[in-house]
Each structure stands twice: as C-alpha cells, then as structure tokens.
C-alpha cells in the first residue's frame, strides 16, 4: 500500500493563524482566509443544525473555518513540505478541552479512527474524496462540512495531485490529534498531534504541532500541500452548561485582536527549514 501525506497540518491548525503572508524570500507564500462560524450540535451530522447562541459574537462559543493557499517553486516546482506550525492566540480567547471524550494517537496510528468516541470529534465528520483532481482548485467554503486538502504526491516516478480528508480529535492531555485520509491515487492514512501551550505579551495561548516528512516512494520528493479548508470547533452540553473548545473574548482591543503564526517549510534537517512569520490583526465581532 502506497502511503503519502499532503503537508497540511496547517489546519487546522492554521486554524487561527489569521492572514499569514510569507516574509522570507526562499519560503513559500501562504494566503489564509478565516471565518467564525456557529458550532454543530453533532460533528457526525454536518447537516444536523447548530448550537444556539454560538458564532461570531463577543463572549460566544464558536468554530473557526480556515482556508489557505500555498504557492512556491523552491521544491522542484512546488512549495516545500510543512514541517511545523505554531499559532499564537490573543488574550481573552478561551480554550477548553476538559470534559470532552478523547481519541488517543495510538488509535489513529493503528489506522482505526472508527474506534474513536463520536464526541471526541473536534471537526465535522466526512469521507475521503473518491476522485483525484488534475489541479488543486481554490479552497472552497465548507459550510460546516468535513475538512479537505489538496496537494502533490509522488506516484510511479511522477508528481500528481491528490485530495484528502482532514479530521480533528480531542487528544488525551488537552491537545488535538489529526488524521489525514486519502484513497486515490495513493492510499493516505497519516496521524499526528499538537498541544496548546502558554504564551505571553499580547497572546494568551499558542498551539504547536510538528508534521513528519512522508515520502510516497523511496528517494522521491515528499508530499506537499497547496490548498486546504478545515473547520475546528466543538461543544457538548453538561447539564445546562454548554462547554466549547473555543470561546471568543468578551472585549476586543482597538484595531482588532492580535494574532501570530509561524510555519516551517523544508524537506531536509531542521537547520535547513524556512520559517514564515506574520503578526496580524483580526477584526472585532460586530456588536
């Protein structure tokens, strides 16, 4: 079975790296669009309705849809693989993982995501695309649907495009685990995890994840990401209280919420990776 991984950990993980643009000449360029959404009542049923009083409001529980496009030619005509992502969140953003069922990384490494508790889903459920595109289209709005990504993989000595599903799960210890699945033209089953950490200054928390370099063929170029769309956000009811993974701050600084994202690209040792960094202002919700 051939295995590949589209370098798209930025999912959601870029789940809050708002408005990234490359500042390094040798690194890829990353364009990000973000939309705050209400939270699905049931992540396993994307058309099952949303929790009331969630979405883009001050102090409200919310989900975050992130769409991004990566461009570059430094890796044989394509962007280099993503190796690490760090996302800083503004002060006042509440992140809560306690109380949610979890799915262990070992379960995903065993390629048994069906054994994960349904309430451990941190993103809408879906199925891997059953057809491969000739080229990656612009990332489309999900409207509460499952995360998808498109990129380039090596197959039979050539570079071809492939689309995959992205699924996020609550992880033991308070982080998030991700599972990327594709069926054509290569079989893709790639798990990885990330953790929330403390931050200082303008930021309250940060999320950090590392992505393994995956080669489809020995000695062939690794898989890379070109576009992705993913929604991260979940909530459960405990008695009369709604517990949400993410909650918007009750106040917004003049000019918007500060945000920061760093992404490392490369196929060699860590010392050769190129880092893309940007600090941005996220518009305040309308009152």
Enumerate the language-model features and the residues they cover.
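C-terminal segment of classical bacterial N-terminal signal peptides
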Residues: 16-25
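Ser/Thr/Pro/Gly-rich, low-complexity intrinsically disordered stalk/linker tracts of secreted
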Residues: 25-287
